[in-house]
């Protein structure tokens, strides 16, 4: 048996870093935020896909209201909605036409107020998505800005009569060759027929002109580069406050901010973006002290120093928290249980996107991947020691779900959910609590798929019951926002799923698990993913060692990376979590690493009864030390 050691290097490095002034030499120490964040789980809802109340095939606010009892039973503290404002729907709601009005497809402002009030009555907070960096090109601000240089909104956007360099010219030429160029992400500039200038800066799609927060270091040779204190950028910052204040006035409890770290241009040292958000935080604390700002940033050292309460562990992060679940080299002892058909997973099966093969590191061993992630994650968590929290996500609207590729059985998904739900601050993406499937090659709806990146598979309707529309809507299947996939199929693409389903209905194919991927099928099954998720959330609420401000201490040996073992402790109570995502039995000794965290029962010998057991696993105390044994695809949570 190999001896394990707690990884402390990254933690010590982070602690030393936190002893220095915050980024930008800023001495402010922010409060972490409302108390509910400490033990909370945030539930992300893509509103077009949660529940349709009027039979048009698209989810809406009244549909969510009808499911508040379900959400309360799940045990989450807050719901975060993807954009619900009036949109052009070229990019799934992220091309906003009116920040002050709910899109009619979802209902009215009054419907949202009703949702807030009814959610609050059940102890649930409501957070909205704030797209701070751009608008739709159909937004009235942009339409006026196109006309002249001396109007109210003229400098809300970045305009130029020429492109800055040859690269910009080539990018624009390439983009315009695409028949669907309005949904193309190449380059930073878009050609315009506006009376004032020929080009405007875009953030993502061509229909998403960048709002002008100014340049940290404007180039005098580029007249379109205004300083952050110019009238236009100052007016945009005030507009941002106006939007936040408007919805806080309606009872909303917070915002998740899209692209939060990219608003100010040419800001390499992040000085001006930090100043911008510190200004917002000071204003918010003075006027709305119990509200939450959560960022799409991916670097808590910077994000939390800018005043945010929460930063998110982004799927796009290099050391992403799912990489450890795929063994690209296939260990001699049987390899990862998540390897595809005994062979090497494809890029698409690993990540759901047609990324270039040379962007994927297939040489990294499982141990190296796990250590890379532990170093990264420990550094991030330690950087929150005095300010805010770092959130782990099960998935989201931009990336495939945890049920993807060959990770497609209930036990596999429970291992993954156990990992996320025992992290400091989990964000649970709707449908992941029942194991909803991400399939590639789904229909491209409202700009979900672009440049080889597929997002439709993560946006399919919530599956409530059996049937052709899975209880999401009373419409016919062809009217659904996206198709539903309720069977436990081994298929990895939507066309494969349709072929498999025909064979299944003809009695020629069998599912890989019992029941269906629906709430109805799992509600009364004590072994279901849904009830496992509920149990994990309930355990969090009653166990301060699992709360967001408690420590995360990984235990690791690079010669035997699995089982994954880590401690969560608040100094009074300690949990050990051990997870084996592989296809082989694992046994390790952890005596020295857990000795100081044992409770008064530390002298007891024999089997220790875990708080939670997934599959077959044991924790045994012997005269030679503490031994953890886990069968394939299993895990235990032990209170030390």
Identify the meaning behind each predicted range:
Residues 137-178, 277, 281-461, 466-469:
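Conserved alpha/beta catalytic core and glycan-binding cleft of carbohydrate-active enzymes
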């Amino acid at each position: 048996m190999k001896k394990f050691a707690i990884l402390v290097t990254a933690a010590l490095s982070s602690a030393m870093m936190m002893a220095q002034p915050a980024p930008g030499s800023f001495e402010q120490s922010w409060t972490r935020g409302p108390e509910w964040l400490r033990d909370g789980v945030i539930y992300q809802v893509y509103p077009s896909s949660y529940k349709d109340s009027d039979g048009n095939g698209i989810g809406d606010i009244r549909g969510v209201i009808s499911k508040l009892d379900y959400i309360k039973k799940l045990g989450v503290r807050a719901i975060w909605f993807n954009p619900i404002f009036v949109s052009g729907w070229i990019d799934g709601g992220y091309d906003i036409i009116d920040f002050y009005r709910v899109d009619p497809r979802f209902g009215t402002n009054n419907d949202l107020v009703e949702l807030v009030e009814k959610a609050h009555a059940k102890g649930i907070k409501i957070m909205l998505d704030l797209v701070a960096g751009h608008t739709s090109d159909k937004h009235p601000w942009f339409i006026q800005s196109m006309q002249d240089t001396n109007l109210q909104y003229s400098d809300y956007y970045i305009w130029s009569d020429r492109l800055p360099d040859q690269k910009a010219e080539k990018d624009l030429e390439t983009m315009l060759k695409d028949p669907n160029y309005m949904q193309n992400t190449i380059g930073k500039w878009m050609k315009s027929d506006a009376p004032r200038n020929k080009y405007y800066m875009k953030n993502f799609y061509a229909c998403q002109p960048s709002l002008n927060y100014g340049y940290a270091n404007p180039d005098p040779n580029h007249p379109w580069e205004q300083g952050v204190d110019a009238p236009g950028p100052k007016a945009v910052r005030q507009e941002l406050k106006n939007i936040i204040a408007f919805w806080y006035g309606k009872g909303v409890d917070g915002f998740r901010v899209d692209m939060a770290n990219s608003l100010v241009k040419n800001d390499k040292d992040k000085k001006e973006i930090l100043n911008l958000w510190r200004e917002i935080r000071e204003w918010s604390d003075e006027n709305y002290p119990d509200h939450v700002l959560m960022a799409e940033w991916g670097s808590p050292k910077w994000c939390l120093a800018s005043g945010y309460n929460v930063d998110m562990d982004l799927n796009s992060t290099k050391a992403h928290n799912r990489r450890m679940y795929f063994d690209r080299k296939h260990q001699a002892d049987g390899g990862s249980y998540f390897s595809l058909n005994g062979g090497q997973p494809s890029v698409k099966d690993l990540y759901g996107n047609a990324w270039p093969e040379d962007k994927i590191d297939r040489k990294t061993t499982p141990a190296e991947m796990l250590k890379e992630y532990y170093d990264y994650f420990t550094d991030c968590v330690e950087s929150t020691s005095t300010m805010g929290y770092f959130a782990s996500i099960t998935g989201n609207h931009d990336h495939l779900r945890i049920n993807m590729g060959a990770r497609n059985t209930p036990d596999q998904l429970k291992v993954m959910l156990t990992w996320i739900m025992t992290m400091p601050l989990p964000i649970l993406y709707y449908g992941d609590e029942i194991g909803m499937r991400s399939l590639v090659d789904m229909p491209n709806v409202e700009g979900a798929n672009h440049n080889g990146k597929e997002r439709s598979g993560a946006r399919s309707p919530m599956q409530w019951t059996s049937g052709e529309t899975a209880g999401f809507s009373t419409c016919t299947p062809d009217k659904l926002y996206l198709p539903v996939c309720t069977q436990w199929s081994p298929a990895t693409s939507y066309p494969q799923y349709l072929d498999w389903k025909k064979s299944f209905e003809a009695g020629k194919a069998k599912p890989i698990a019992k029941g269906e991927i629906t709430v109805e099928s799992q509600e009364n099954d004590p072994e279901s993913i849904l009830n496992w998720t509920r149990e994990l959330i309930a355990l969090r609420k009653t166990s301060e060692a699992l709360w967001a401000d408690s420590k995360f201490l990984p235990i690791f040996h690079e010669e035997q990376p699995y089982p994954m073992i880590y401690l969560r402790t608040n100094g009074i109570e300690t949990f050990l979590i051990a997870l084996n995502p592989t296809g082989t039995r694992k046994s390790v000794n952890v005596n020295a690493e857990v000795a100081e965290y044992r409770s008064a029962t530390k002298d007891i010998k024999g089997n220790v009864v875990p708080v939670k057991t997934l599959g077959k696993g044991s924790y045994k105390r012997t005269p030679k030390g503490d031994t953890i044994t886990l069968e394939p695809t299993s895990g235990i949570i032990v209170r030390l």
